[in-house]
Each structure stands twice: as structure tokens, then as C-alpha cells.
Amino acid sequence: MEEGFRDRAAFIRGAKDIAKEVKKHAAKKVVKGLDRVQDEYSRRSYSRFEEEDDDDDFPAPSDGYYRGEGTQDEEEGGASSDATEGHDEDDEIYEGEYQGIPGAESGGKGERMADGAPLAGVRGGLSDGEGPPGGRGEAQRRKEREELAQQYEAILRECSHGRFQWTLYFVLGLALMADGVEVFVVGFVLPSAEKDMCLSDSNKGMLGLIVYLGMMVGAFLWGGLADRLGRRQCLLISLSVNSVFAFFSSFVQGYGTFLFCRLLSGVGIGGSIPIVFSYFSEFLAQEKRGEHLSWLCMFWMIGGVYAAAMAWAIIPHYGWSFQMGSAYQFHSWRVFVLVCAFPSVFAIGALTTQPESPRFFLENGKHDEAWMVLKQVHDTNMRAKGHPERVFSVTHIKTIHQEDELIEIQSDTGTWYQRWGVRALSLGGQVWGNFLSCFGPEYRRITLMMMGVWFTMSFSYYGLTVWFPDMIRHLQAVDYASRTKVFPGERVEHVTFNFTLENQIHRGGQYLNDKFIGLRLKSVSFEDSLFEECYFEDVTSSNTFFRNCTFINTVFYNTDLFEYKFVNSRLINSTFLHNKEGCPLDVTGTGEGAYMVYFVSFLGTLAVLPGNIVSALLMDKIGRLRMLAGSSVMSCVSCFFLSFGNSESAMIALLCLFGGVSIASWNALDVLTVELYPSDKRTTAFGFLNALCKLAAVLGISIFTSFVGITKAAPILFASAALALGSSLALKLPETRGQVLQ
């Protein structure tokens, strides 16, 4: 047995000696032909190979395969396991080399580094002679980030722009499309859902508010987590939350559960905008970033068009429904809610095929993962361009030194929920600290000014875009009221009413021994009238009231004439039998008004297409600030035309005009937000600003709609002032065109 171990050890030592001799001779031959080479990125020269000292030719006896034989003499050999025998620290193979990945620590000697400036002996993110991590200053950390930014930009240029970016463009576009759909879903289903769920005006207002509240929470939550856990992972989770609760909301029956599902659906989709733009920007080189981020904004418009088209095609089809008794009803509007979850589901499926952002990997010290993703980008684009032979030549990428990590505790420490609690608290503390750093000395001014721009833009845009349809409905109501027919002092005896009465007022009438059977009443009012010995059967009504009327010996059978419809009326010896079941409230239902909501939203969303195209083509030519300020000024000017909107067609045209000129400012604001913050704060800052945007939207909608039917001057003044303030603040921000991504 001992003889076998001795032979084995001798064989290993001989093989190692041969390998080292071959390595040294190869190095000498290469050095003779090419003594020194120069890095094309860093312009830095270094030796291709260097002699190595091999002091440890064989493992210590204490590393023995058999734990009890560690005291044997080295020459006897029984001191190595299958995992460690033949181990030489100088000849140790870097783990990633099994997959062809160069080591993060290999940039000091003999390897090519991608960089835009010379780096002195960078190894693993630390410069030569640098002190321990605890003594590192903010200036040194800033220097590292600047070096990484230049280096990363050079790598993206080598990877080129091609098939990989376009594939990711459509994948992330689906996620952005899901956000555009979410904004319109509740507004489209309310005319139909209000009867099924018996929604009062306050219930409808809360349902519209809860979506923005959920998106506000989601933007802040997922934006902060994406800087710590990764863009792709957080986007997958947020879209999954959105799709699951959107699916549930199409089946739940009660108002409370529907409200809860739409809240969590909004929380899920709230992460899409901050993560999508940050994620995509980290795969784009500087010369492509502004244009392609603007093209990406088109998917939000596509989401709005998709929602309007689906509402128009699905909701009016009452045959697309079924009922299980009187407790469970599934009408066509629920099919529409289900269909609106499709973009989110498709985005999840497509996103699983995409890699994590390599910039996130580098910011978190994951060199190997970043190198593999960038190699995938390079190889995909080169194959698509017909150059599969081109090799990804970058062998070292700078990584940022990590000063804080998630707290790890042993698996045998406490219970599983205690361990998860510790990790969650640690993660929450890091997210909160990262958020507070956006208000640190370096970024305080930028953050405060961006808050002002985001708030004013959102306040005016969302306020006006909701005010427009409300004004259109008000104009429709005014026109409808102008066509009301009035019947004063009529006397009707022994007549059977079995048809439809609409938009009528009957004053001072007398109805004696009349029958109202199968009657449909829509916007009908009876005032100061007498009903004696009358019979009402199977009567349905909406917006119908009896004011100051008297009913004598009258029977109501199977009607929906509930108590609140009799205003200051007297019922003498009158009987109500078997009232209709269902919602006792007046609802508008689906009809011409609902169709108008779909049509106006469809046109208003489609009208932003020209603005999207213009902003994409000019974003990198005129700059982000000029685009933002110019579009805001044009939007401000367009607000003054609102005073001329005295008809439906005029208001629709003004809505399209405002949407078309304001979209360019939104595109510029998205690009500017991405480029103003560094990679470790990008989604956190974007998420916070987007959450502020939703808060401003709620305020704008509440304030603007309160003036409907009262005055148009106040909304015009508020919107113009907000846009003017936003454009003036935007001009004080730094221009980011031509800058590398921090």
C-alpha cells in the first residue's frame, strides 16, 4: 500500500516538473518574437509572460487524504486527497477558466484590459499601494467608477449594436406596454363594472385612485430593490405580481377584493418603468442611447392603443359572459381585464431568455458573470452581421470594490424565518441608505430639481388627460339636456305604456288607471304629478326620478323603482312586490358614452406617435435639455387653445395636439433620469421620481376634474404654470448628451 502511494507522488512531481519546463520555454520563445505588447484600450505596455517562482512543489503533509496520516514524512507521499494532490498555489487554475473566462485579478500582467485611460496595476478593483478597504475615501471610489464607466463604454462599442439589443428592445417593450395598459384598464371597465359591483361615485373614485397608489408604491419598492438584487430578477418578480393579481381581479366578485387585486397589480407594474429604462440603457453605447431609449417609449403608446382597441372589441359583446346562479357573474368586461394581462405574461416569458445587466454585475463585483454576458452580446451581434470569426478580445473588466454586503448567517443559527428576517432587514437598510444617498451632497441639487420637473410634468399631463374626457362628457351632457322634451299638464287615463321613454320631463300630469308594463325609463323625470289606481310591472329605469309626486292605490311589481327615486313624494295605500334584484344604484352602463371613452382614449394615445418619432430622431442631435424644455414650452402654449374648445370635436383635437407635443418632453425626461445617476443609484432614483410622478398625477386629476362644468380657466392656468415652471427647472440641469453612462 505504501509503495503505491510513493509511486503516485513521484509521478505527480515528475508531471509538474515537465509542465513547468514547457511553460518556461514557451514564454522565452514568445518574448523573443514579441517582447512587449500594448493594450489598445489602455495604451499601456506590459510583458506577455513572466517567470514564475515555484516554491511549493507539493502539498504539506497536513493536507493528507487520510486524516490520521498527516505526520508522515513528505517523501512517503500518503498526504494528499483527490481534490488537493498535486496542488501548487502558483499553478492553481482560476475557476472560471474551465469556461474560458479570464480572471478578474488578471489585469495586472499579461492580459488585455478594456479601458479608456491608463490604469496602474489594477487588480480586482484596487490600485497598487492602496490601503485597506476601511481607509478608502469617496474620491478613490469616484475614481474607480469613472474608470469603470470609460472602460464599459469601450466594451459596448466593441460589442457593437445589433441583434442582441433589438431582441432586448422588444422584450422590454412588452414590459413597458404592460404599464401603458394598466393605466387605462380601470377607466375602461368602470362603465360596465359599476353595475355588476354596484359602485357609488366614491367607490369609482377610490378604484381609480388605488391604481396610481399601487404604482407609486411599486415604483419606489422595485426601483430600490433593482439596485441591490438585479434588474432582470426584480423585473421578473414585479411583472409576475402584476400578471397574477390582474388575473385574479378578472374573477373576483366583490368590490373589496377587486380593489385589493388592482392595488397589488399596480404595485407589480410600478416597477416596469424605472427598471426597463435602466436595464436597456446599460446595453447601449453612448451614441445610441438617447435614440433607442426614445424608441422604447413607443411601447407605452402601443399599450394604450392595445387597451382601447381591446375595450372597443370585447366589452360591448354581452354574449361573452356566463352566470352561475345569482352569486357569480362573468361578463365581457372581465374578459377584457384578462386580456389586458397578456402583455405582462408574454414579457415574463421573453425576459427569462435574457441575461442580467452586465453593468449591475460589475457594480457588485461579479466579474465572471459580466464577462460572460458581454461576450454573449458581442458574439450574437457579430454572428448577425456575418462576422462569426471575430473574437471577444476583452480579458479583464474593472469591478467596483464592495464595501457592504448582505448579512449572511449560518444555517444552524435560529429558525428559517429569523434568518430571512435578518436578511430582509439588512436588505431594507441598504435600500434605504442608497435612497438617502440620492440626497447626499453630490446629488442633492440634481435630485431636488428632477423632483420639481417630474412633479410639474406629471401634474399637468395627467391632470389634463383626465380632464379632457370629463369635459367631453360634460359637453355631451349639456347637449343631451338641451334636447330634453317637456310635457306639462298632461292627463292620461286607461292607457298601457309598454315602450321606452327617454330624456323627458313630465310636469303636473295626472295618470289615472294606467298600466306601465315592460316600460324602459331613461333620464325621465316626473314632477308634481298624480298616479292613481296605476300598475307598474317589469319596469327598468336609469336616471329616473319622481319629484313631489303622489301615488294612490298603486302597485309596483318586479320593478327597480327603489326608495331613493321618490324625492319628496307621497305613497298612499301603495304596495311594492318583488323588487328587482341587483344593484339599486343608477348606473350609466355601456352605450354611446362608453364607446366615446374608448374612442377618445384611442385617438389621444395614437396622437403621440409623431412626437415619439420626432423625439427619437432628434434626441441625440439637439440634446436632452433642449428637447425637454422645448416640448414643455410647446405644451404650455397649446394649453391656451383649450379656451376655444366648446364642442366635442374641438376638445378631441386639442387632446391630440397636447399629447403629441408633450410626449417628447417625457421621452427626454426618461433619458435624462437614466443618465444623471450612477449605476448603483439609477433604478433607486428613477423609482423614487416615478413614485413622485404618480403622486402628482393623483393631485392633478383631483384638482382638475373638480372644475369640470364650472370653469376652464383654472385648469388652463394650473397646467400652463406647472409646465412653465418645469421647463425653467429643466434648463438648469446638466446636459448628458455625449457622456458615458456613469
UniProtKB/Swiss-Prot annotation:
The Basic and acidic residues compositionally biased stretches are 40-49
Q: Where is this region: Disordered?
A: 40-144
Q: Which residues carry this modification: Phosphothreonine?
A: T84
Q: CDD domains per the record?
A: MFS_SV2A
Question: Where the protein is mainly located, per its record?
Answer: other
Annotated region (Interaction with SYT1), positions in chain: 1-57
Keyword Glycoprotein, does the record have it? Answer: yes
Instruction: Tell me what PTMs the record reports for this protein.
Output: Phosphorylation by CK1 of the N-terminal cytoplasmic domain regulates interaction with SYT1.
Q: Which InterPro entries match?
A: LD_SV2 (IPR055415), MFS (IPR011701), MFS_dom (IPR020846), MFS_sugar_transport-like (IPR005828), MFS_trans_sf (IPR036259), Sugar_transporter_CS (IPR005829), SV2 (IPR022308)
GO CC, alphabetical: neuron projection; plasma membrane; synaptic vesicle membrane
Transmembrane domains' residue ranges: 170-190, 206-226, 234-254, 263-283, 295-315, 335-355, 448-468, 599-619, 627-647, 652-672, 686-708, 713-731
Q: How does it assemble?
A: Interacts with SYT1/synaptotagmin-1 in a calcium-dependent manner. Binds the adapter protein complex AP-2.
UniProt protein name: Synaptic vesicle glycoprotein 2A
Q: Name the species this protein comes from.
A: Pongo abelii (Sumatran orangutan)
Coding gene?
SV2A
